[in-house]
Amino acid sequence: MASLIYRQLLTNSYTVNLSDEIQEIGSAKSKNVTINPGPFAQTGYAPVNWGAGETNDSTTVEPLLDGPYRPTTFNPPTSYWVLLAPTVEGVVIQGTNNIDRWLATILIEPNVQTTNRIYNLFGQQVTLSVENTSQTQWKFIDVSKTTPTGSYTQHGPLFSTPKLYAVMKFSGRIYTYNGTTPNATTGYYSTTNYDTVNMTLFCDFYIIPRNQEEKCTEYINHGLPPIQNTRNVVPVSLSAREVVHTRAQVNEDIVVSKTSLWKEMQYNRDITIRFKFDRTIIKAGGLGYKWSEISFKPITYQYTYTRDGEQITAHTTCSVNGVNNFSYNGGSLPTDFAISRYEVIKENSFVYIDYWDDSQAFRNMVYVRSLAANLNTVTCTGGSYTFALPLGNYPVMTGGTVSLHPAGVTLSTQFTDFVSLNSLRFRFRLTVGEPSFSITRTRVSRLYGLPAANPNNQREYYEISGRFSLISLVPSNDDYQTPIMNSVTVRQDLERQLGELRDEFNSLSQQIAMSQLIDLALLPLDMFSMFSGIKSTIDAAKSMATNVMKRFKRSNLASSVSTLTDAMSDAASSVSRSSSIRSIGSSVSAWTEVSTSITDISTTVDTVSTQTATIAKRLRLKEIATQTDGMNFDDISAAVLKTKIDKSVQITPNTLPDIVTEASEKFIPNRTYRVINNDEVFEAGMDGKFFAYRVDTFDEIPFDVQKFADLVTDSPVISAIIDLKTLKNLKDNYGISKQQAFDLLRSDPKVLREFINQNNPIIRNRIENLIMQCRL
């Protein structure tokens, strides 16, 4: 079914970038969050769209499934599984330590009676007696000997449906799999000098780290992910894993690659960051005993320092994220001391420092990759601030300490009145320490964090030392400077392109042939077949699929699935604590939010409408999770999307992610879903409308919301492709049998195609109406 594309996007939406992390930490892990990046910094989007983009921090993420690679001979690293994916029978892998272990693995096809076969093992022709009694599964057998002239013995067979095998060197042993899928387990062979065992592989293979052994076992038992089984995934040489290590000194410029017009330069720099905080203190009106606000605000600091004998002019912009709002109220009288709000940064807060200097590294910082930094930690201690009251002793806010720890670096753009500067944004996480802060002559004491009252403590600046490294694409001519393309321009261009593309997509609805659409809706579209209409290379297609998944991850559909997963988890835990059958039935109905309150249902229409509307929000997700043979709204939506992508002349890899995500959210907004119970049909729409009727007469019957909630939990949910109004019209004008009615209620694609091929105007009008709802 074409809706496979949406399920594939939901299961493969794994990409996370630094801005997602910053927004999540800043909003989800604190309360009363104030985000004030200041007038000089803007990092809403990446500065440009070029190449692989920047590396957000210095953390290396090891891939879960690395490959596929072509057959080769090499010494696999210890503690890594080598996952083998042979396609034909014969020798799959062989390896030896040339002392006391010669080990090979042979693959035998299904249904092989006992026979003698000749295999080439370690350069010798060897005759072995083999068999495979399984009618459906392939058989892997290990053959080994302990002396050069010894005979081979057979060990540890693995009967496999996915036809996958794995080997790992670890802790003086060689580990393999044995048993029968889907219940295969690991076994091992002891050997000396195991780390020097060279292995020759005769099939494509993958590399999986040992800490992901559970995932490796899942692949052995159930097969590789669907995305690995397309013709677009091709194996590459193992040399692709090699990394060219360049010895680099600090404060050095290295030419990584060069052509006639462009060159890649690696800049390594020592760096001295000086910064300070700024604050705003606003006194409230009245008699002078109350303050309305004490808050942080961004500030730019310019300074000079010496780097390798060269004087560097730099400036920094310091801002904070995720502040905590405190208050103090000494009483209700006008002469009682009070502070409506004062900000404090602590463990859930972040400090951002945007840094720029006049060195060569920042002159062409437009196209950047491999960005990394190492910085020291700095401790910031607050000073004292005296609240001058008209009469009485003055309260004093004093103390407070936080330590800034480096937590990542990315590109940013700083704007001034005269110039736009591409700079580096350093992100710091915070920890609190002694001394705590307090307000004298009040009960506020022993609080931790750094308040905004006097964060600099009479210091001119705080200082951090460290280094950074980046690779920048610059003109080969050092006298030419790359024009700055800041993110605002890039985003405005993208919005304009999206606007034009939406108009084109909506106009293409008139050009879709209905019979072809039904055929396309029945195809199992994957990501590569969906996007094949765009002119691009295979590499660009892979990158494009990743970009689509990254954008789709933030869609309403993906968010709903995530929320539903959490709800089901909560329901499962409540089931484990339930003591009655009734409570279990109520809790396990995770598709509804009314299940826990179903016992006190009111008979009013308003209450039933509210409950069915709540259930209807989950029906699309239930249908996606339990795929049926019938056609659904997402099949039509995906087919229309594919057709429009193929017909479009304006779609590009840049605009595709937004278009796919919008289509999943906006195509066919007026949806109705149904569940069938014998001769009774229950329907609920996204707009809260609900009704029940009999199949043979289409006469309405009372709507039992309790029964509907139970059916939604236990029965398949079906898209009402042909709605009740259309069915009644069809019965009144053409007459349909009970079986035809059942087929149309189940959205049987064969029956739909028959009506369309017969040019039935009622069915064609309904499908055309659905196509016209596929608008952006």
Swiss-Prot record:
Region described as Spike foot: spans on this chain: 510-776
Keyword Ubl conjugation included in the entry's annotation: no
Residue numbers covered by motif DGE motif: 308-310
Keywords, comma-separated and alphabetical: Capsid protein, Coiled coil, Disulfide bond, Hemagglutinin, Host cell membrane, Host cytoplasm, Host cytoskeleton, Host endoplasmic reticulum, Host membrane, Host-virus interaction, Membrane, Outer capsid protein, Viral attachment to host cell, Viral penetration into host cytoplasm, Viral penetration via permeabilization of host membrane, Virion, Virus entry into host cell
A single BP term in Gene Ontology: permeabilization of host organelle membrane involved in viral entry into host cell
Region (Spike head): 65-224
Region (Hydrophobic): 389-409
Pfam family for this entry, one: Rota_VP4_MID
Membrane-spanning ranges: none
GO CC annotations, alphabetized: host cell endoplasmic reticulum-Golgi intermediate compartment; host cell plasma membrane; host cell rough endoplasmic reticulum; host cytoskeleton; membrane; viral outer capsid
Protein family according to the UniProt entry: Belongs to the rotavirus VP4 family.
Name under which the protein is recorded: Outer capsid protein VP4
